[in-house]
């Protein structure tokens, strides 16, 4: 009912991909009252990704942060639309983490969950969502009680026997396994190893990000 109007609004605001999903059993444990999600995606600059050559760069760090901020702004447009229609909407920031003693390096809702359910792409061996733009994409999510229906079918993983990202990862954080829906993230990616390795690059800035697994991904070519 609202999907086309909402997609038009968010694309005009700067999104490159929009997805809608009914979460079912995949609801956020912290916010189970929201059974639907709007996934907002914005692709990263190919020129910036090309600056990554075996190590993270200042160009990528700055672009990463700017893209996240843009996504958060677009998410607020979605919140306004949904709440003006009489529903509730909770924005989940593009770069979000709410660590506790049990679950480090996780947020209140995985962006990839909503993106996969909406049919925007599949989870690759690098732990990232592979979309029509490859894995060089950032996401924000809006959780809501507005009834929404996925516009595309769920996609299977197409990584096959490729091990490029695993071999390129300096932290050894990528297992090289195919992601199985419902499995824990740790089966394909060790977030702690990745985070610990990035401490080497504190000179770039607080919260520096790597991007090597994106830069070598064949789906970005």
Residue ranges of model-derived segments:
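Non-catalytic, usually N-terminal nucleic-acid engagement modules in DNA/RNA processing proteins
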Residues: 1-68, 73
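Catalytic cores of enzyme domains
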Residues: 66-221
């Amino acid at each position: 009912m609202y999907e086309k109007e909402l997609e038009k609004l968010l694309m005009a605001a700067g999104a490159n991909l929009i997805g809608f999903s009914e979460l079912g059993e995949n609801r956020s444990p912290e916010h189970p009252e929201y059974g639907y999600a709007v996934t907002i995606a914005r692709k990263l600059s190919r020129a910036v990704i090309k600056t990554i050559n075996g190590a993270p760069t200042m160009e990528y760090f700055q672009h990463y942060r700017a893209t996240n901020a843009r996504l958060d702004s677009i998410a607020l447009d979605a919140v306004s639309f949904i709440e003006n229609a009489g529903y509730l909407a909770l924005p989940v920031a593009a770069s979000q983490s709410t660590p506790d003693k049990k679950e480090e390096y996780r947020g209140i809702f995985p962006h990839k969950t909503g993106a996969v359910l909406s049919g925007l792409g599949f989870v690759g061996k690098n732990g990232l969502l592979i979309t029509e733009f490859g894995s060089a994409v950032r996401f924000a999510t809006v959780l809501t009680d507005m009834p929404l229906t996925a516009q595309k079918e769920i996609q299977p993983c197409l990584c096959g026997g490729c091990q490029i990202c695993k071999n390129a990862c300096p932290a050894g954080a990528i297992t090289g396994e195919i992601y199985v829906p419902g499995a824990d993230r740790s089966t394909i990616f060790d977030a702690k190893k990745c985070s610990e390795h990035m401490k080497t690059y504190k000179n770039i800035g607080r919260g520096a990000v790597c991007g090597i697994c994106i830069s070598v991904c064949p789906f970005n070519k």
